[in-house]
């Protein structure tokens, strides 16, 4: 009998511990923090990680309330929510400059011309973190800009519909790291004054940063571009990192200007990649990158040299007119003249498709 007592004691302890553990799980509940309605201040709603999908949908935030807050100049602070409906930034009021008295006719004409450009303002911070956005985000004004004066933070958020924030000016840093864009993500002619954080972000069928300007650093380490990725004619004043990034379809950096470090180490380009006429004013790193299809570096300018000898090229890259490159180190093996012509023709056809597609979308 005595030999059984320790076992019974251990069993009793195990049951008690199990009960305690079970109680702890039962006590973990969905918590919701929100700002009271009808009062000034940010539109705030935070749902804890313990909330179920049903609980998040029951506490969904309508897009209309977000647009109302932005129209009133209030900040938006949403964490762990479901956002239902479209955010159409073209609905924000247009800001016009008052024309003071006493100006010359020339000054009045210049100010009137500025007022012809539509300018919309988002005054407060916009935070939508670890959330699900079911509707679209749109700014499609063809003759105006959308200016975000505060921070924009979309960390870990899933966008189920398209995002088009083209012709936007971001005065503070933009954070979209670990976000998921299931459809298109357009930031055409954007201006990023403090840079872009997009590490480990998954982009969908089409991503466009065409002619965007980045004054601050760009960190897209480990990002996945599932579809076409356009960085044509971008200007990057600060270091840029696409280290370990994955590019699934055609990728265009043609005409880009990298004034500081451009890091493409360990990146994988599964389809055609275009770096024609790119200016690398700073260090260009491509060590251990992989180009599995055609790569076009023609007329690129490596002002501080290149490390393309450390790159895996499945096809010999095009380097006609390229400056600052060790020609003998670019690519492994060689192709016949017919193969080179075939590669050139294929790249030109893909480039023509990208241009036609871009014109169609404008």
Walk through the language-model features, giving the residues of each.
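Alpha-helical transmembrane segments
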Residues: 349-360
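Bacterial N-terminal signal peptides
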Residues: 8-21
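N-terminal leader/targeting and pre-domain segments
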Residues: 26-344, 348
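C-terminal "tail" modules appended to repeat-scaffold proteins
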Residues: 338, 359-362
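N-terminal secretory signal peptides that target proteins for export/translocation
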Residues: 1-6
């Amino acid at each position: 009998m005595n030999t059984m007592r320790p076992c019974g004691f251990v069993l009793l302890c195990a049951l008690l511990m199990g009960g305690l553990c079970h109680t702890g799980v039962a006590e973990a509940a969905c918590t919701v923090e929100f700002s009271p309605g009808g009062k000034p201040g940010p539109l705030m709603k935070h749902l804890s990680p313990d909330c179920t999908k049903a609980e998040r949908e029951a506490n969904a935030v309508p897009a209309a309330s977000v647009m109302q807050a932005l129209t009133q100049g209030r900040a938006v602070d949403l964490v762990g929510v479901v956002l239902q409906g479209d955010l159409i930034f073209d609905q924000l009021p247009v800001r016009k400059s008052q024309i003071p008295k006493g100006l010359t006719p020339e000054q009045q004409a210049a100010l009137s011309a500025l007022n012809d450009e539509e300018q919309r303002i988002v005054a407060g911070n916009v935070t939508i973190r670890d959330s699900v956005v079911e509707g679209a985000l749109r700014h499609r004004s063809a003759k105006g800009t959308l200016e975000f004066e505060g921070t924009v933070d979309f960390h870990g958020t899933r966008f189920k519909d398209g995002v088009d924030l083209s012709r936007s000016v971001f005065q503070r840093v933009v954070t979209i790291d670990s976000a998921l864009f299931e459809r298109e993500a357009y930031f055409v002619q954007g201006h990023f004054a403090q840079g872009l954080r997009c590490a480990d972000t998954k982009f969908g069928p089409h991503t466009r940063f065409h002619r965007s300007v980045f004054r601050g650093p760009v960190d897209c380490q480990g990002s996945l571009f599932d579809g076409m990725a356009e960085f044509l004619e971008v200007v990057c004043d600060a270091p840029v990192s696409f280290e370990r990034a994955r590019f699934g379809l055609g990728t265009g950096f043609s005409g880009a200007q990298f004034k500081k470090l451009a890091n493409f180490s360990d990146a994988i380009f599964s389809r055609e990649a275009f770096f024609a006429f790119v200016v690398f004013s700073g260090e260009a790193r491509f060590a251990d990158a992989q180009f599995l299809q055609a790569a076009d570096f023609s007329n690129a300018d490596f002002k501080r040299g290149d490390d393309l000898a450390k790159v895996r090229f499945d096809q010999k890259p095009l380097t006609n007119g390229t400056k600052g490159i060790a020609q003998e180190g670019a690519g492994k093996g060689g192709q016949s003249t017919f193969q080179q012509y075939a590669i050139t023709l294929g790249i030109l056809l893909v480039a023509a498709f990208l241009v036609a597609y871009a014109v169609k979308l404008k």
